Amino acid sequence: MKAFLIIIMLAMVMPTLGPKRGSQMGEEIRKLEEEFGKAMIQNDAEAIGRFLADDWIIIDPDGGIIDRARFLGVIKSGALTHQAMDSTDMRIRIYANTATVTALTTSTGKYMGQEFKTQERATDVFVKENGQWRCVISQLTRFAGK
């Protein structure tokens, strides 16, 4: 009976412990996403690189895969610049040392001299290693609006 009461008490307490930790980590991820957006607008390849794992890739809306070196090279060259990058409907999920983020992102800028405005569903997957979150993969899907 005593063991049963302990289990019941733990069951009542555990839900209050988990979300607090998860929401703290979720806030860390939200801040990283905001800082990443600022670095993109500033065209700061060095700062952007600090958010990305060495083996990071992005899957573009056409299904192409771009690795970290190529992506940062495009940023450094100035071929891709952003004037704005705004994310809404951000959903963050934490799983131990992994986090997923989905958001609706609207961006304006220039690519190879051509102006663009995009609206995409973006997904980022972060892994926490040695106390630091790094994005390991990003994926973009055109948003048609629904």
Where are these regions (language model features)?
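A beta-strand edge to alpha-helix "cap/lid" segment located at domain peripheries
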Residues: F4-L5, K20-K146
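Bacterial N-terminal signal peptides
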Residues: I6-P15
